[in-house]
Amino acid sequence: MDIYKIAIDTFLAETSECKASGCAVFFGADIAFQDIQLHTHRNKSELHFMAGHTMLSIPLASILSIEKLVLRDIQTTEYEIITKESGTITLDVV
């Protein structure tokens, strides 16, 4: 397993349109989706995730880090986004 910290633009280039499963856990709320087409993009102030009929927007200023874990044995890449509000978004991309 290889772990890397990556920039937002690298994350967007790798996940702009992909098949993914994921979950987002924030204080008082959570969402999850499985094996669905994911679209990611950003504007000047927010990072947007669209999975099916679900959209999640995160202020860019609240993102502390994005980690990329390459799981070679199961041919999956996992991305973990950690926010200032102690929120975590985990995406598994095949």
Indicate residue ranges for each PLM-predicted region.
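Structured surface patches comprising rigid loops and adjacent beta-strands/short helices at the edges
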Residues: 36-37, 55-72
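Amphipathic/hydrophobic helical signal segments and adjacent flexible N-terminal regions
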Residues: 1-8
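Short beta-strand-centered aromatic/proline hotspots
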Residues: 31-39
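Short aromatic-glycine-enriched beta-strand elements
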Residues: 43-48, 77-79
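Glycine-centered tight beta-turn/hairpin loop motif at sheet-sheet or coil-to-beta transitions
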Residues: 26-28, 51-55, 84-88
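A short, Trp-centered hydrophobic/proline-enriched beta-strand micro-motif
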Residues: 13-25
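Short, compact, well-ordered microdomains
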Residues: 64-94
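Short, solvent-exposed coil/turn segments at beta-strand boundaries
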Residues: 14-15, 41-44, 74
